Structures are given as C-alpha cells and as structure tokens.
UniProtKB/Swiss-Prot annotation:
This is Crossover junction endodeoxyribonuclease RuvC. Mg(2+) 2 binds at residue 66. Homodimer which binds Holliday junction (HJ) DNA. The HJ becomes 2-fold symmetrical on binding to RuvC with unstacked arms; it has a different conformation from HJ DNA in complex with RuvA. In the full resolvosome a probable DNA-RuvA(4)-RuvB(12)-RuvC(2) complex forms which resolves the HJ. The RuvA-RuvB-RuvC complex processes Holliday junction (HJ) DNA during genetic recombination and DNA repair. Endonuclease that resolves HJ intermediates. Cleaves cruciform DNA by making single-stranded nicks across the HJ at symmetrical positions within the homologous arms, yielding a 5'-phosphate and a 3'-hydroxyl group; requires a central core of homology in the junction. The consensus cleavage sequence is 5'-(A/T)TT(C/G)-3'. Cleavage occurs on the 3'-side of the TT dinucleotide at the point of strand exchange. GO terms for biological process: DNA recombination; DNA repair. Keywords: Cytoplasm, DNA damage, DNA recombination, DNA repair, DNA-binding, Endonuclease, Hydrolase, Magnesium, Metal-binding, Nuclease. HAMAP family: RuvC (MF_00034). Mg(2+) 1 binds at residues 7, 139. NCBIfam families: PRK00039.2-1, ruvC. SUPFAM superfamilies: Ribonuclease H-like. Pfam families: RuvC. The lineage of its organism: Bacteria, Pseudomonadati, Thermomicrobiota, Thermomicrobia, Thermomicrobiales.
Amino acid sequence: MRVLGVDPGMALLGYGVVEGGEPLRALSFGVVSTPAHLPVERRLVVLHDELAQLLEHWQPDVVALEQLFFARNVTTALAVGQARGIVLLLCGQRTIPVVEYTPAQVKQAVGGYGRARKREMQEMVRLLLRLPVLPQPDDAADALALAVCYFQYSRAAQLERFT
C-alpha cells in the first residue's frame, strides 16, 4: 500500500509518499512551490501539473489530504481551498480514493496527543519513518504526517475488528 500525503497550499504544497509495511518507509517528500508573482490561475496550473506528475510517478493507492478545519485568515482559507480543489480533481479523474484528516486527528494519530507541537510531530515522523534527520520544510513534514496518519488509523480499524 502506497499513500501520498498532501498538505495543501497555494505558495507551498507539501507532499510525502509513504510505503506501508514494517517499518513504514518514506519514498519521497518535498514541496511544490508556486511563484508569488504569478496570477492565481497560473499558480493553480503549476500545482495541477506538478501534482499530476507526482501521481503518475508514484501511483499511490490513496491520498491523505489535510481537511480545511478553520482559518483565521479568509484569504489564506480561500487559497488552501483552491489548492485542495486541484488535489480532489486530479484524484477524482484517476479514481484515487481521498481520505481527509483534521490537524487534530493527525496530531493524535502520529504524536499521540491532539495538541502536539510542530517540532514534536516532526520528531515522531522522523522516528516512525526512520529518517536520519527531521523532514524539512514544514509542509513536507506535515504531508508525511498525513500519510503516516492514514496507516495509523488503518491499523486501529483492523485491531477493532478483532476485539
């Protein structure tokens, strides 16, 4: 099972590809960046094209996407929503299932605490994926955490079936 975690954003869209198994294995992670000087419609094309290449190359079985839970800044929320739309469109076109998680769900599944701090989360991702250093930038680390979250919730669901 291969999962692509996506932390959506207009300026930076984080991605992380994780292969299931014991242990979980990070295959790739990074960010897709869009130049701020481009108009929004061109930035969306950049996100679309780069993410399409990632989906084609890694062939994930599922995409774990951060759910837009709330935002203090309306402009930021709109930009994140537009980036999420690109992710959902591409997955829909390829019939790739999308599972959405709130930041609190990711923190609970990966960090063991729904209010874990960013550094704690990065350290847990590093440990769970046996990475030599903390994953950077933050958007890529968040995307890896989303992919790990998918596996953690899947394991919990399997355990519940046997109890």
